[in-house]
């Protein structure tokens, strides 16, 4: 009897140890993301990384510096760039996949107060920024066709377009009626012209026409990053973005690492203005900066529809990080 008792005790002990070992084996190990190198352009995408400002592996560069980072020793693990540029880079053979979309449109059309009937008509002077090959013009013609081509004028960049809205005049002094502009430049320009006002939310116009959400900045992950690490990074990014949307003071605190002129130099924007805009809602009920998070593969149809505006082909699932 004593031998049976000892045998049962040992058996229970072994079972307990085995159970403990099994439990220890199934506890997921936290993935270290601290060594991942991240590069974003200055501007709106920085808002998504408000909690990474003090991360020594996170860099912010001017938009025109991104193209040199797709290859070579300086190419980061995570690269944020506008969707179309990234898809074209992949088509040209760079070692990345598209992983997520983090901005969903911050374009608006504002009136300067110069249009007597306050209704956009053929012949009204309308300012776009960039040139005929850039997103504002491509998007404009997708939404409005050629009806207003007679009055279209182009400023070199968003800052000059903002100046046109603030003054009511094109850079050569010509009076203008409407200005196509992005946030947060719109916010600042409206403050400078008491007659100016919002005329159309381009995100809403796009949604009504296409039935889909607009897409702008995308996250690309280098192929050398394994699936577990990449997905852990995306999960953390989604959580931090959603937290800031729920509580904009988190973004405000994160961006507060730099202040004044140094902040503008670091981020490419005045953080006080951006947080103000971020707290506002657009016509679709989303934050006015268009910040959000969706895994790219989950909205492939939206991506393909957006790319079609540029005459680009439907994407293959092979270029998506999963």
List the model feature ranges, each with a label.
Residues 13-16:
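C-terminal motif of bacterial Sec signal peptides marking the signal peptidase cleavage site
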Residues 18-21:
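Bacterial signal peptide processing site
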Residues 28-55, 112-188:
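Bilobed "Venus flytrap"/periplasmic-binding protein-like clamshell domains
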Residues 37, 94-102, 125-128, 204-211:
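A structural signal for short loop-to-beta-strand junctions that line the ligand-binding cleft
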Residues 47-48, 63-96, 107-114, 162-171, ...:
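Pocket-flanking alpha-helical
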Residues 88-99, 188-207, 265, 271-274:
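Ligand-binding "clamshell"
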Residues 154, 159-254:
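Pocket-lining segment of extracytoplasmic ligand-binding domains
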Residues 225-309:
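Secondary-structure end/capping motifs
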């Amino acid at each position: 009897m004593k031998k049976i008792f000892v045998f049962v005790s040992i058996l229970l002990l072994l079972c307990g140890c085995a159970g403990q070992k099994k439990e220890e084996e199934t506890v997921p190990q936290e993935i270290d993301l601290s060594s991942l190198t991240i590069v974003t352009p200055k501007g709106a995408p920085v808002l998504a990384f408000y909690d990474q400002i003090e991360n020594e592996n996170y860099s912010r560069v001017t938009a025109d510096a991104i193209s040199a980072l797709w290859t070579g020793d300086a190419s980061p693990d995570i690269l944020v760039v506008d969707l179309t540029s990234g898809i074209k880079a992949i088509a040209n053979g760079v070692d990345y996949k598209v992983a997520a979309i983090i901005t969903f449109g911050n374009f608006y059309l504002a009136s300067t107060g110069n249009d007597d009937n306050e209704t956009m008509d053929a012949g009204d002077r309308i300012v776009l920024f960039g040139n005929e090959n850039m997103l504002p013009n491509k998007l404009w013609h997708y939404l409005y066709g050629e009806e207003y081509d007679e009055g279209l004028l182009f400023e070199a960049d968003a800052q000059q377009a903002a100046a046109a809205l603030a003054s009511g005049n094109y850079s050569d002094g010509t009076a203008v009626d409407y200005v196509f502009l992005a946030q947060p430049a719109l916010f600042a320009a409206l403050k400078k012209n008491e007659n100016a006002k919002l005329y159309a939310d381009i995100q809403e116009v796009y949604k009504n026409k296409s039935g889909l959400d607009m897409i702008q900045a995308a996250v690309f992950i280098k192929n050398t990053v394994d699936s577990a690490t990449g997905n852990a990074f995306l999960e953390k990014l989604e959580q931090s973005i959603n937290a800031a949307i729920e509580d904009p003071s988190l973004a405000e605190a994160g961006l507060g690492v730099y202040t004044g002129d140094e902040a503008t130099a670091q981020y490419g924007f005045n953080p006080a203005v951006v947080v103000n805009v971020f707290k506002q809602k657009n016509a679709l009920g989303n934050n006015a900066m268009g910040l959000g998070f969706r895994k790219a593969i989950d909205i492939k149809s939206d991506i393909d529809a957006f790319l079609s505006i540029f005459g680009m082909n439907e994407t293959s699932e092979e270029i998506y990080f999963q």
